[in-house]
């Protein structure tokens, strides 16, 4: 029985190593032009700087919905090597009145995005994993978001 298990495990490993995962496709979701308030540094050392920043507004535009950013917060950490990690939560209100909570986790300039809404019309977003990035690194308040398929 042990031998059969080992043979099965070896066969699985050979099959897995011989196949290549399929890269995901990206479908454009929306662009966001975010407005931010002042950043408040709440922890600073030689190793890092941590800050809290409010998201005070913004415009959302895309092929499936558009709206405004009602508000939110972003926590960021800048390491001594210049890397920036950030986590943000903000609320979008669509032009037809639906509310969508956006949760972001970023290693700047790349952003992983999840959505949460109780709207029947936009319920499909609850199953979307998205990726965002600024098209121009000099304009990090403007981001484009892509659905990972």
UniProtKB/Swiss-Prot annotation:
Q: Does the keyword Glycoprotein apply?
A: yes
Membrane-spanning regions, if any? none
The positions making up the signal sequence are 1-18
Top EC class for this record: lyase
Pathway membership, UniProt: Secondary metabolite biosynthesis
Q: List the keywords (alphabetical).
A: Glycoprotein, Lyase, Signal
Recorded effect of pH on activity: Optimum pH is 7.5.
The answer to whether UniProt assigns keyword Transmembrane helix to this entry is: no
- Please name the GO terms that the record assigns under molecular function: lyase activity
Q: How does it assemble?
A: Homotetramer.
Q: What is this protein called?
A: Hydroalkoxylation enzyme phnH
Tell me the classification of the organism that encodes this protein: Eukaryota, Fungi, Dikarya, Ascomycota, Pezizomycotina
């Amino acid at each position: 029985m042990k031998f059969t298990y080992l043979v099965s495990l070896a066969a699985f490993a050979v099959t897995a190593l011989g196949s290549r995962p399929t890269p995901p496709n990206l479908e454009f979701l929306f662009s966001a032009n975010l407005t931010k308030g002042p950043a408040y540094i709440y922890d600073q050392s030689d190793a890092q700087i941590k800050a809290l920043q409010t998201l005070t507004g913004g415009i959302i535009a895309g092929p499936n919905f558009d709206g405004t950013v009602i508000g939110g917060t972003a926590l960021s950490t800048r390491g001594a090597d210049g890397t920036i990690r950030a986590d943000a939560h903000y609320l979008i209100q669509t032009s037809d009145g639906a509310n969508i909570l956006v949760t972001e986790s970023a290693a700047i300039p790349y952003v992983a995005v999840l959505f949460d809404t109780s709207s029947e019309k936009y319920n499909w977003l609850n199953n979307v994993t998205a990726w965002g990035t600024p098209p121009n690194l000099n304009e990090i308040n403007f981001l484009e978001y892509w659905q990972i398929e």
